Amino acid sequence: MATNEDQKQTESGRHQEVGHKSLLQSDALYQYILETSVFPREHEAMKELREVTAKHPWNIMTTSADEGQFLSMLLKLINAKNTMEIGVYTGYSLLATALAIPEDGKILAMDINKENYELGLPVIKKAGVDHKIDFREGPALPVLDEMIKDEKNHGSYDFIFVDADKDNYLNYHKRLIDLVKVGGVIGYDNTLWNGSVVAPPDAPLRKYVRYYRDFVLELNKALAVDPRIEICMLPVGDGITICRRIK
């Protein structure tokens, strides 16, 4: 069992590793938010899954604890019941969703790596919410294309969260806009992409950050002028853009 000090070091270290993922100006301020309003109210299962994920070599991919709290609040505010998640990893945001929606709520969860999902599955099962999850391994686009063919799927989702391959974000949006209901919400994660969206051309960015930055910028420009949605870009985690379908 990790000590409180271990947990602090894990969170702080990860925060530094990704270059202020919370986009705040100091680690101390981010730690204040976590210790004051996030960790004290974090569900025990969420805490356990966060600690399990911290030991995984790709833990940089997980949803931050403050973003998990935000998603939980949002889901409850909009009374979401039928939801979708593209990009699962070990399931931290998935668990946040499963805990927030009603007992008869559903989550269609898609990821290309089932092994990562199974790492968090025991925690999800222990929390008693695994019955809400329909996990499908593989690329999401073919699944979405099949769903769109059936009219009954149009406008059937209350909430959709996307945290997957950034080079396909626009492709996802073109399909998801038909699947989310009018008044429903789509959340796109990483839309400030480690702050690189405002980095100068010659900035010393990591190769993967530089590669995906153009796709993130393209998405942000498209969402900003899409008349079918209202948007709100928030500096939570690595940036999340909330899109509410209005027509």
Swiss-Prot record:
Function field: Methylates caffeoyl-CoA to feruloyl-CoA and 5-hydroxyferuloyl-CoA to sinapoyl-CoA. Plays a role in the synthesis of feruloylated polysaccharides. Involved in the reinforcement of the plant cell wall. Also involved in the responding to wounding or pathogen challenge by the increased formation of cell wall-bound ferulic acid polymers.
Residues given in the record as S-adenosyl-L-methionine binding sites: 63, 85, 87-88, 93, 111, 140, 165
Lineage top rank: taxon: Eukaryota
Residues that hold substrate according to the record: 21, 163, 194
Assigned EC number: 2.1.1.104
Binding of a divalent metal cation, residues: 163, 189-190
Keyword Calcium among UniProt keywords: yes
EC class: transferase
Pathway(s) of this molecule: Aromatic compound metabolism; phenylpropanoid biosynthesis
Designated name of the protein: Caffeoyl-CoA O-methyltransferase
Keywords, alphabetical: Calcium, Lignin biosynthesis, Metal-binding, Methyltransferase, S-adenosyl-L-methionine, Transferase
Any one Pfam family match given in the protein's UniProt record, by short name: Methyltransf_3
GO terms for MF: caffeoyl-CoA O-methyltransferase activity; metal ion binding
Cofactor(s) in the UniProt record: Ca(2+); Mg(2+); Zn(2+)
Organism: Medicago sativa (Alfalfa)
Catalytic activity, reaction form: (E)-caffeoyl-CoA + S-adenosyl-L-methionine = (E)-feruloyl-CoA + S-adenosyl-L-homocysteine + H(+)
Leader sequence segment: none
